[in-house]
């Protein structure tokens, strides 16, 4: 790999299929390299980003099912946090903990300790978990993401009622990559 200090506007940088962070795109532009010119980001990854953006515009927070240290999840988190509060969950165990925060059985302090390094700056569990959509790192199992979304949905139904949950839970099944 080439060091950042060695890059010039004449260099070609190829963005991999899982995308890159907003911060890296900005850094490339500052050097004079247009990241979109050699962008091989998978369309399914971009669909997740676009869905996250739409969720943010509709005042939903985003739960990202993924491995927080994976490059695709880092890129998705970066793109998502530009538009909405976000938190990363790895599995059903972490999602169960999240639902306990949603239900009020766990506190904000519990949330911050448990999800340390996995939520966006300024995330407020007391308000940012009122309206939620779930997206995923596209290389995660679609069935597991659906189980996670279903668990979050059930938690929202328990809190807001079956007649009102659609105001608080966004159906994002169309972002799953099979």
Where are these regions (language model features)?
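The feature marks the mature, well-folded catalytic cores of soluble enzymes
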Residues: 1-178
């Amino acid at each position: 790999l080439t060091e950042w200090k060695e890059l010039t506007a004449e260099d070609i940088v190829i963005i991999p299929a899982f995308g890159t962070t907003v911060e890296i795109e900005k850094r490339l532009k500052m050097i004079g390299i247009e990241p979109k010119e050699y962008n091989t980001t998978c369309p399914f990854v971009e669909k997740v980003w676009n869905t996250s953006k739409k969720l943010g515009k509709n005042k939903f927070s985003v739960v990202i099912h993924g491995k927080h240290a994976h490059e695709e999840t880092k890129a998705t988190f970066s793109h998502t946090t530009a538009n909405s509060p976000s938190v990363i969950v790895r599995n059903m165990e972490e999602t169960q903990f999240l639902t306990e925060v949603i239900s009020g059985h766990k506190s904000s302090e519990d949330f911050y300790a448990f999800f340390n390094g996995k939520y966006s700056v300024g995330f407020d569990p007391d308000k940012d978990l009122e309206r939620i959509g779930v997206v995923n790192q596209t290389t995660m199992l679609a069935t597991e993401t659906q189980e996670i979304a279903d668990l979050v949905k059930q938690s929202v139904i328990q809190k807001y009622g079956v007649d009102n949950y659609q105001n608080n839970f966004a159906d994002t099944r169309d972002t799953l990559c099979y």
